[in-house]
Regions:
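N-terminal regulatory/effector-sensing and dimerization cores
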Residues: 2-102, 137
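A general marker of short, structured functional hotspots
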Residues: 5, 49, 114, 120-121, ...
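Short, flexible segments with low predicted structural confidence
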Residues: 17, 55, 122-123, 149-151
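A short small-residue
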Residues: 60, 129-131
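Exposed alpha-helical structural elements
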Residues: 82, 120-123, 127, 162-163
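Aromatic/histidine-rich interaction motifs
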Residues: 91-126
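Short, Lys/Arg-enriched, Trp-marked, Pro/Gly-tolerant hinge/linker segments that flank
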Residues: 105-119, 132-175
Length: 175
């Protein structure tokens, strides 16, 4: 059975720090609440409107509901093969040439990166959240692939940044 590419998580209770083991890469967006990602003795705080990348492996996270409302996030999962297929499709079909000159200590040394989402990315995730309310969408592989392609396009065509750098570094893992 194919694992879903797009998942919405809703947590109404604070469950403390959790260990999350990922077998695929993930790009997520905070819809409501606060998320903490732990890196050794450091803690990164994410809030509504932040986009984040999680690499394959273990992550220590904590999700906080806010103001009596549940914590909500949308996550897109992908493999290096998925990413390579989508980038090739964007290049062949639309002539999208992708380059990335960005490199900083943050994205070189961490298995996660976070940043505020830019407008088109924020709108994309809000729209995806609306799609996920529709039961039919949840089991539609074609719709998931189209949304995933749109997400990859929005990141790959954006100016150089940590999220783009991490995403494009995952193509190398497919070779």
């Amino acid at each position: 059975v194919q694992q879903p590419m797009i998942v919405k998580y809703v947590e109404s209770l604070h469950n403390g720090i959790q260990s999350q083991a990922l077998s695929r890469y993930a790009i997520g967006y905070i819809l409501r609440g606060t998320k903490y990602i732990y890196d050794g003795d450091k803690r990164q705080t994410l809030s509504r409107g932040d986009v984040f990348y999680l690499g394959i492996g273990h992550h220590y996270i904590e999700n906080f509901p806010e103001g009596g409302q549940p914590f909500e996030q949308v996550l897109f999962y992908y493999t290096p093969g998925d990413l390579q297929r989508i980038l090739m499709h964007l290049n062949i079909t639309y002539g999208l040439n992708i380059s990335n000159e960005h490199s900083c200590e943050n994205c070189r040394n961490r298995s996660h990166v976070t940043m505020p989402a830019w407008n088109s990315l924020r709108n994309f995730f809000i729209n995806t959240n609306n799609y996920l309310r529709d039961e039919d969408f949840r089991h539609d592989e074609t719709a998931e692939n189209i949304k995933m392609t749109e997400l990859i396009y929005l990141i790959a065509s954006h100016e150089d940044c940590c999220i783009k750098s991490k995403l494009l570094s995952n193509v190398d893992a497919a070779k």
